Amino acid sequence: MMSQRYFKLLVVFLGLFAMIASIAEGKGRHKNGGGSRKKTNTVNNGGNNGGKPKVPMCGTTAATCSKGSPSCKGGKPTCGSKGAFNACGGNVKVTC
């Protein structure tokens, strides 16, 4: 009888711990993850990918520039500081 009481207390404690842990992660008990902030699109991120800018690609690797940093503006790959893309190698084109 005494062990059942402790078992019930243990179950309640573990349940509370799980709820607190999920709230601390920002998940809560909601279908959408429970976070109070919605992810929003930022400029030049090519969709809702957590706010990270979309990077031009040479096949499966990130493209590099001779000057400046690579980015995708309006769906087209560009280099900052009037730079040019370094050669991808072969017939591979730079894509966004």
From Swiss-Prot:
Induction: Expressed during host infection. It comes from the Eukaryota. Residues 41-51 have a biased composition (Low complexity). Keywords: Host nucleus, Secreted, Signal, Virulence. GO terms for cellular component: extracellular region; host cell nucleolus. The keyword Signal applies. Residues 27-51 are annotated as: Disordered. Residues 29-36 are annotated as: Nucleolar localization signal. The keyword Signal applies. It is found in: Secreted; Host nucleus; Host nucleus, Host nucleolus. Residues 1-26 form the signal peptide. Residues 28-40 have a biased composition (Basic residues). Rust effector delivered into infected tissues to modulate host functions and contribute to pathogen virulence. Binds the TGA1a-binding DNA sequence to repress the expression of genes involved in immune responses such as the defense-related transcription factors WRKY18, WRKY27, WRKY33, MYB51, the defense-related proteins NHL3, RPP8, YLS9, AZI1, CRK11 and the jasmonate pathway and regulation genes JAZ1, ASA1, ASB1. The nucleolar localization signal (residues 29 to 38) is required for host nucleolar accumulation but not for the nuclear localization, nor for the augmented plant susceptibility to pathogens. This is Candidate secreted effector protein MPL124478. It comes from Melampsora larici-populina (strain 98AG31 / pathotype 3-4-7).
